[in-house]
Amino acid sequence: MAITVHPLSDVKASEIGDGTSIWQYCVVFAKARIGADCNICAQVLIENDVVIGNNVTIKSGVQLWDGVRIEDNVFIGPNVTFTNDRMPRSKAYPEQFLQTVIKAGASVGGGGQLYCPASPLAKKRWLEQVRS
């Protein structure tokens, strides 16, 4: 199986599993790791310190910041928001960003917000909305 990358995407990563499709206007940083048989929909950003398992679907408009870990068979709905810094300051970065883990088989509904460090989202759990 081959990897499919839309010509309007900017994909620098070399660790992408077979059967994965990356659609238009995506940006994938060089050190990101993406498993096999994933579907990365349009307008997704994936930073360097992101690990995505196998058979993962990430719908349009999602940004995966450093520290996000997504296990196998996960669905991330459109426009889901992740954060990796509780006290963001422009140009003042922590030595290491906090991790957010989405466990195998979990689903995050469209527009969901995950504040890090989130408790790992349990296996086969559906997250509709997280409120602050």
Predicted regions, residues:
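Short Cys/His-rich zinc-binding micro-motifs
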Residues: 10
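Flexible, glycine/small-residue-enriched loop-and-beta-strand segment within the central core
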Residues: 2-7, 16, 22-124, 129-131
